[in-house]
UniProtKB/Swiss-Prot annotation:
Pfam families: IQ. The gene is SPATA17. Keywords: Calmodulin-binding, Cytoplasm, Repeat. This is Spermatogenesis-associated protein 17. GO terms for cellular component: cytoplasm; spindle pole. The keyword Hydrolase does not apply. One of its GO terms (molecular function) is calmodulin binding. InterPro entries: ASPM, IQ_motif_EF-hand-BS, P-loop_NTPase. It comes from the Eukaryota. Residues 32-61, 55-84, 91-120 form the IQ domain. Its main location: cytoplasm. GO terms for biological process: establishment of meiotic spindle localization; mitotic cell cycle; spindle organization. It comes from Macaca fascicularis.
Amino acid sequence: MATLARLQARSSTVGNQYYFRNSVVDPFRIKENDAAVKIQSWFRGCQVRAYVRHLNRIVTIIQKWWRSFLGRKQYQLTVQVAYYTMMMNLYNAMAVRKQRRWRGYRVRKYLFNYYYLKEYLRVVSETNDAIRKALEEFAEMKEREEKKANLEREEKKRDYQARKMHYLLSTKQIPGIYNSPFRKEPDPWELQLQKAKPLTHRRPKVKQKDSTSLNDWLACTSARSFPRSEILPPINRKQCQGPFRDITEVLEQRYKPLEPTLWVAEPIDELKLAREELRREEWLRNVNDNMFLPFSSYHKNEKYIPSMHLSSKYCPISHKEQFRSENPKKWICDKDFQTVLPSFELFSKYGKLYSKAGQIV
């Protein structure tokens, strides 16, 4: 009770104290509230930033794993494509190698035998060398024969000239022009004239024409009834010496053929002949005798005439692809022809049919 009475006595002052105490505490409360708000905002900021950092770290890890997964997947696709590309390139290279080997074998065996052609060319080269050597020897022999013939011709010409100029030979009384007394020794032509004989001109034989009349066949009038004697040479007649011309030249000059003038040599119908010759040349130069007409409807009804080469039942030979034709149906056995170099028929005749310097070898 005493306490209650004491508290009731103080109740008037408690309100004032409470008011003053609260009025003094309000600024501290506001300050503490602001401090608490600042601390709380700073703490929440740190908490949020830590959480954001955590989220960033987690997102980075997730992105790293995801991107690594996508990278590995893309890398696997790239490796797979590269593997398939490498395998296709390898397959293509192997196929090309097989095709190259097979085509080379096929060409060498069936189309173009390189070793056969090489051996053939080697034999042809050796044969050509042998023939060229033989031809060179033959040419040298011909050249020697030609030189010998030229020397003989020159010798005969000098002999004929010496016989023709035999009248210039020196005598006991008069020296010749080649034996001048002012020279120490005579000219070589003087010795040539001494060795030569004087040239004698033979008279041309007169050919007697045999008549074919009936009277000539009689025994009394026939030329074959009595033997005829040849013309005898003149008796005690000296040979004329002097610079006379050859009888053949004189006869050629005397009986030379007629040389007509241009007016006489040309024919009268020269213009007509020239026109015929020109027409003949134009006809020879003409490629097609048919008249050229447009291609619209003129050649529409013409029947195509195939060439003889295409209309034949035999197929054309593929040149430059094979050296001989193969027909397995005509083979006696299953073996193919042996690739042995055949003999040359032309070269085998060498030394048997050719002549060397007019003598059969």
